[in-house]
């Protein structure tokens, strides 16, 4: 499924709700898209729990620019998917995920250069990669195949 992941930008988090659960966040100004930044855009397999697990391991996709997926992060499911997850935005809560209204167009974009990621058997996706050797290597490392 195609997803975007958004994390609070500490410099823009005026209500200091980074890593706080949904109820606390609501009591302190709500989930404000303008305080978030996109840290991943791409395709992953599985459901929301699988996404949480994937982005808490060293094997997360090479274009991921965030910290381990945590409470207060937002996962946006884009379009239809084989898992039957309703497209929309999901707040990562203390336990599970809460469907929320979230205008991702108000979030800051990812850092780096724009890149078209083409993977076998998947729809191409535009993403961003930081302009340093390590980030560029990680972005393509999972997608290179030997040809003889």
Segments from the language model and where they lie:
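Short, flexible beta-strand-to-coil junctions
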Residues: 1, 6-12, 75-84, 118-122
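Short structural boundary motif marking the start of a folded domain
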Residues: 1-4, 88, 109-116
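Extended boundary segments
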Residues: 1-44
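Cysteine-nucleophile amide-bond enzymes
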Residues: 2-5, 62-64, 95
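Short, conserved turn/kink motifs that form compact alpha/beta structural patches or helix kinks used as
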Residues: 33-82
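Short, compact, well-ordered microdomains
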Residues: 66-107
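N-terminal low-complexity, intrinsically disordered segments
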Residues: 109-140
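Non-Sec secretion/translocation targeting segments of pathogen effectors
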Residues: 143-148
